[in-house]
Amino acid sequence: MRALFRILAALAFAWFAIGGPASAAAANREIIIAKMQFGAVPTLHAGDVITWRNDDIFHHTATARDKSFDVDLPPKSERNITVKQAGKVDFYCRFHPVMTGTLDIEP
């Protein structure tokens, strides 16, 4: 009985030492710019990578109003960023201020 208790205690310690159940791996998400507008914004979690892809013929940016990112996107280019923390982040294009969107980043 004592040996079983030690084994269970060791397993419990190992479980908590590695952080419990595995957290979800960071995902790669894409936001496409086309026809002078940002495409659909996917569900995001802190740690995810966003690929901003400009399929338009015009130069754009994806610029956070809180200054957490500013992605320069010449025509037919793409750039990656990693979202660091949960919360809402409003963004826009510096060249075309009517182009706007919001990232809703979950923990």
Which sequence ranges carry the predicted segments?
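Extracytoplasmic copper-binding redox domains, predominantly the cupredoxin/blue-copper superfamily
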Residues: 2-4, 8, 15-107
